[in-house]
């Protein structure tokens, strides 16, 4: 198992760089029941100069760890209907990820009702008590959610879910306003969500973020192709 990385070291490693999200869910073209695809994506990202990887599932994370030493932000996506949160939604997923020795565990920290019925602040405090040396990232959709998670003890706040909750800003590109507001509050922000172009990434970096995660624009060829095709048709 890799040594735990300190918050300071992680922040230094990801500064002015790109973390690449390498994920594919069942039903998507790059998903393979046998695995083996995401580590190829991760290796390509590393060769391009990526400073980290975001990955989903124990299987994919282990396969990625076998091919790269880049720090990993890990999640487990699992539905708990009728509740909406599905990104590392319960302690069971946190426990599985903690065993992998990854740099950061990310989890849904929105205000939506949770499967366990508990306020998210209570859950954050519990996971920090249980795993005091583990870094955690809050996936949020609004400024209030980010502030609440940070005040509860979360290490990093990600703008991952802006536009993916019914009450958050709905827009085509990244939520620059949310990113700027969180940075101005002095919160370590990992910008993520609908960052489609290098220019957008550069603009976000200039806002003073701790890090940037890019997924669909790099590792989802179906989405990338669709964007080009739509541009020609429009």
UniProtKB/Swiss-Prot annotation:
Q: Which GO terms describe its biological process?
A: carbohydrate metabolic process; N-acetylmannosamine catabolic process; N-acetylneuraminate catabolic process
> Superkingdom of the source?
Bacteria
Q: Any idea which GO molecular function terms this record carries?
A: N-acylglucosamine-6-phosphate 2-epimerase activity
Which reaction does this chain catalyze? an N-acyl-D-glucosamine 6-phosphate = an N-acyl-D-mannosamine 6-phosphate
GO cellular component terms attached to this protein's record: cytosol
| Enzyme Commission number(s) of this protein | 5.1.3.9
What does the UniProt record say this protein does?
Answer: Converts N-acetylmannosamine-6-phosphate (ManNAc-6-P) to N-acetylglucosamine-6-phosphate (GlcNAc-6-P).
Task: Please give the name of this protein.
Answer: Putative N-acetylmannosamine-6-phosphate 2-epimerase
Q: What is this organism's lineage?
A: Bacteria, Bacillati, Bacillota, Bacilli, Lactobacillales
């Amino acid at each position: 198992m890799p040594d735990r990385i300190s918050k300071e070291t992680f922040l230094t490693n990801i500064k002015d760089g790109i973390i690449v999200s390498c994920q594919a869910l069942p039903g998507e073209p790059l998903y393979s029941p046998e695995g083996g695809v995401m580590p190829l994506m991760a290796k390509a990202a590393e060769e391009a100069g990526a400073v980290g990887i975001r990955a989903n599932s124990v299987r994919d994370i282990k396969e990625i760890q076998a091919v790269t030493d880049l720090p990993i932000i890990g999640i487990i996506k699992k539905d708990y209907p009728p509740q909406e949160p599905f990104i590392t939604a319960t302690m069971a997923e946190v426990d599985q990820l903690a065993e992998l020795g990854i740099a950061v565990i990310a989890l849904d920290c929105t205000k939506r009702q949770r499967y366990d019925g508990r306020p998210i602040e209570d859950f954050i405090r519990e996971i920090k008590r249980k795993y005091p040396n583990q870094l955690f990232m809050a996936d949020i959709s609004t400024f209030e959610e980010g502030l609440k998670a940070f005040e509860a003890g979360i290490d990093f706040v990600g703008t991952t879910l802006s536009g993916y909750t019914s009450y958050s800003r709905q827009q085509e590109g990244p939520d620059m306003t949310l990113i700027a507001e969180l940075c101005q509050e002095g919160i370590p922000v990992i910008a993520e969500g609908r960052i489609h172009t290098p220019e957008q990434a550069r603009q976000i970096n200039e806002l003073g973020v701790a890090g940037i995660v890019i997924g669909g624009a790099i590792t989802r060829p179906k989405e990338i192709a669709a964007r080009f095709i739509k541009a020609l048709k429009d």
